[in-house]
Amino acid sequence: KYIHMKKLMYAVLSVILCLSAGTGYAQKKAFTIADLYKIHNVGTPLISPDGRHIAFTLTDYNLPKGKAMTDIYVMDTDGSNLKQVTKNGKGNENPLWTSDSKGLYYVSSVSETDQIYLYTFSDRQSHKITNFSMGVNDPVLSPDNKLIAFSTEVYPECGADSKCNAKTDSLATNGPVQAYLADHLLFRHWTEYAAGKCSHILIYNIKNHTYTDVTPGEFVSPTFMLGGGIGYNFSPDSKELCYVSNHEAHPEATTNSDLFIVPVTGGQAVDITKDNKAWDGSPVYSQDGKYIAYRKQLIPGYESDLFRIALYNRQTGESKIITNSFNNWIDDLKWDADSKSIYFTGEVLGQEPVFKIDIASQAITPVSGDKSIFGFDLDRKGNLYYTASSVEKPVALYCMKASDNTKVKQLTSFNRELEERVDIRPADTIWVAGADGVKVEVFIVKPHDFDPNKKYPLIMNVHGGPQSQWMNSFRGDWQVYPGAGYVLAFCNPHGSTGYGQEYTREISGDWGGKPFEDLMKVTDALASLSYVDSTRMGAMGWSYGGYMMNWFQAQTKRFKCLASMMGLYDLRSEWGGTEELWFPDFDLKGQPWNSDLYKKFSPSEYVRNFATPTLIITGQLDFRIPYTQGIQYFTTLQTLGIPSRLIIFKNDGHWPNVVKSMPLYYDAHLDWFHKYLGGAPAPYNVEKMVKNQAFTNK
């Protein structure tokens, strides 16, 4: 349901691995948790206005210290002259080229709060630009290079007054009374309480050093995005800003976010999509100024409705959808320089390639070929720069002609040493007849040192969302478990994206129906594979995947053990504890008192069937699926005498911290699966990891 983990690519390495079925793999070591944190993650490329350079971020990890270090790099568009711009590893993000290509604005956490800095290539120095007390997020530079729009949490009564915000925040944070006050819902979201603050968009005047709150009042702007990038952009003449906001009286119960236009000097905002009662967002102006392209849904309250591209004509005020022929989700949008076409990424069959649509004819053309792409940019010569990965290849930066996807050049090789030393496993694909005979795509990753004459334990991983898809991308899950001797399988059952919107829609109102049937038929197919030990099969899942683990507990005894992360256990109490009520209201067809689905599909209603040992992981700050869901489940299993273990991450929400918490997450899984399925032991002692003693001598 959170849109969002994506994109990928594969090339020479897969060929080498295929040619060396036995000895090639044996010469490399098995992939471990430690190897996962040696991966260098390359961020989305940004082409300089003169077309000569690429800026991007690079994130590295320190596993023993639980730290992530992100810095900004620049290189020529042919991949030469690589230079590291920032060298402090202090969360340097969001690089933005100046209009003359002689500098980079970026956000850094080097000071107490995130602020904007300007790096100038002439003196190779960074200069602090903003000093707003509440910090800075997601900056956007105006085309005339004079303004920077950014989002920040402010107290509405203070608006753009930095000192007022600082004083108010200090009293609220440090005063003797520590309480939350709410007179309406959505008083908390994701991992944070509103606490009197809300997100506003401010515009910083670079010359005058002034801040203007262009979204004053009690409304959240930009509203919570359903993917698709930042929720605001400048017009080409730098005179107005288009942004997304939800002005409904009950935003917790509706997806009706609209696009608003406001002068950069502030003033009355105009709602340009008020006629659509579903979600509108991701605005991007055409370079000729005639249109605003944006992503649009049509079904109110349905956050997983098809994302379409619509065009708003700035002269006539009319909007029209131009992607009616594309029946899969659309994510990132970028206008071509001539304003005659739009490039976009779309989720298709376990991939996320780039497509191009001609706005006049509405003809859609594949651009990148079958790749899973995380982010992309274009230059004026028709070159496409993008980051991608595949199951067997970590993320890297690539370039190709947008008109010819047969000639791809890899521009970065930060992970080459790891790829040469460690056995990073590829994935096979099979299709299995699921519910109603509909084919389900299944990815299978075989274990390190695979011998087709042996039998191996299997782990099935079920994705969350539920409206999302597993993709042919690089993930720690896909390598850590095969590295420990398991066959890993992951599939896209009914409800997944990428296989047509009807396939996605069929999970709504049927959480434990067709998706469960799909997964059971996939389990049958996997159990029949000659190299799978059908007596040693386990399953794991996160969010809706965690719910499915709990549903497995209630409906089947096919698995020797389960691992449920951030999973729903009791659907009725979950409704009262979550924050985005539009989701269960739509997917479960109402509220607990007027929909029988809360009982029909709640694992808690089938306790008499429980028998399978289960690992439960949750986050104390998870407001999407409150950690009490995991506690209720653990209490039930313990009372029944069913082997179970509970891990609560104290400082995490729905997504545990990637380097502070996820190592324990992986290790706890390996420990649990080793106990019940017989794969390799976990590399670290779980109890010592919880006590921060696992790396004391390293």
Q: Where are the model-predicted features located?
A:
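Short loop/turn segments that connect beta-strands within beta-propeller blades
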Residues: 76-80, 120-124, 205-209, 263-267, ...
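A flexible loop/linker signature enriched in serine peptidases of the S9 family
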Residues: 58-71, 86-92, 107-117, 131-137, ...
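Residue-level detector of Asp-centered blade-edge/turn motifs that repeat once per structural unit
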Residues: 49-50, 99-100, 143-144, 236-237, ...
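Active-site-proximal cap/loop segments of hydrolase catalytic domains
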Residues: 490-698
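Non-catalytic accessory segments flanking enzyme active sites
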Residues: 46, 149-151, 178-183, 187-215, ...
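Bacterial Sec-dependent N-terminal signal peptides
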Residues: 1-28
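Hydrophobic beta-strand positions that form the internal "hydrophobic ladder"
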Residues: 51-54, 101-105, 148, 241, ...
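Cap/lid segment of the alpha/beta-hydrolase catalytic domain
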Residues: 406, 412-535, 542, 574-581
